[in-house]
Regions:
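Acidic beta-strand-to-loop metal/phosphate-binding motif
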Residues: 8-9, 78-89
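Conserved beta-strand -> loop -> alpha-helix junction used to position metal-binding or nucleic-acid-contacting
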Residues: 30-37, 104-131
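Short amphipathic alpha-helical interaction segments
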Residues: 230-245
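Short acidic, hydrophobic short linear motifs in intrinsically disordered regions
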Residues: 209-227
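A conserved mid-domain beta-alpha-beta active-site/ligand-binding segment of alpha/beta enzyme cores
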Residues: 126-215
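Short, surface-exposed basic-aromatic patches at helix termini and helix-loop junctions that form
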Residues: 22-25, 75-76, 96-105
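C-terminal engagement modules used by replication, chromatin/transcription, nuclear envelope/ESCRT
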Residues: 246-291
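A structured, charge-rich N-terminal accessory region that forms the first stable segment of a protein
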Residues: 1-63
Length: 291
């Protein structure tokens, strides 16, 4: 009987890398996690209603069906369910989640276990926090190593239980954002209380009081966003989360700082649109004059 192997990855980009690394055959499959795990709501259970709520919280309205398929897949038919991961929150949480969805056939490949790859990544990384993850590695670099032979590890019973317990903790913890700031498996939770504390630290500083009111909100938003984000691909999400918390904070809204910020944004958008129209008219005039 042929052994069936399933590779579980965090994104389509990682899927492309893994596809080139394995000797793909009809007995090997690759599945991509259909949701983001580093921000938003994690499913507390696997009912259709709960998974739809998870998709809605992430504004991924079309992924509730794929979430249901992912969580209700029969993982027991595979001899090995292999999770490819590094040390960022997204990939660590995927490993924990798979421990909840599997029994005794879970395996892992941690790219940080390869000392050469790990040290080179830390030396050359341009990320805000140099936390290694699979998608950050180029296929040419990955192809130099025998990942399935040298770095594949079976998750033992005790470790499996710990991973499953970790997933239980995180899916019941309310947090806007989950990030790793080092390669030590420690996941930091970002909630409203933490963002408000960061806001107060900035507002209590001397330089903040010297700023004109019309730039204060922009300064708060940019500093908090920078302190939250781990890598450039997450910057927009961090900005949205910080903006959501600040806009609902009475200290900010009662001072009119949000209104001032929005007025400036609207004016800049209006000016940008007018500039666009002006440039289009310029191009038309040039073509007319050339005739």
């Amino acid at each position: 009987m042929n052994k069936k192997i399933l590779h579980v990855v965090s994104s389509d980009a990682v899927k492309e890398r893994v596809f080139q690394l394995i000797n793909s055959s009809k007995n090997e499959e690759i599945v991509v996690c259909p949701t983001s795990l580093f921000y938003g709501k994690l499913p507390k259970n696997y009912t259709k209603k709960e998974l739809t709520a998870t998709a809605l919280s992430l504004q991924k309205y079309s992924c509730s069906d794929s979430l249901y398929e992912f969580t209700h897949r029969d993982y027991s038919v595979y001899n090995k369910v292999i999770v490819w991961h590094g040390r960022n929150a997204e990939e660590i949480l995927l490993l924990y989640w798979m421990a909840d969805l599997t029994k005794d056939n879970l395996y892992e490949i941690d790219v940080a276990d390869c000392k050469e790859v790990f040290e080179e990544f830390k030396r050359t990384s341009l990320y805000h926090f140099p936390v290694i993850f699979v998608e950050a590695l180029e296929i040419e670099e990955l192809e130099r190593y025998d990942w399935l032979g040298e770095y594949l590890k079976k998750v033992g019973e005790e470790q499996h239980s710990q991973y499953k317990s970790n997933w239980e903790y995180w899916r019941n913890k309310r947090s806007f954002l989950r990030v790793c700031r080092d390669n030590d498996w420690v996941i930091d939770s970002v909630d409203e209380e933490l963002i408000v504390k960061m806001m107060h630290d900035i507002m209590n500083s001397d330089y903040y009081h010297k700023l004109p009111d019309w730039v204060k909100y922009a300064v708060l938003l940019s500093i908090i966003t920078y302190d939250l984000y781990v890598d450039f691909s997450h910057l927009f999400v961090c900005n949205r989360i910080a903006d959501l918390v600040l806009r609902n904070n009475k200290e900010i809204t009662e001072n009119g700082l949000v209104d001032l910020f929005d007025i400036i944004q609207w004016r800049e958008a209006y000016q940008f649109e007018n500039f666009g129209r002006f440039r289009r008219l310029q191009q038309v005039n040039k073509r007319l004059l050339a005739k």
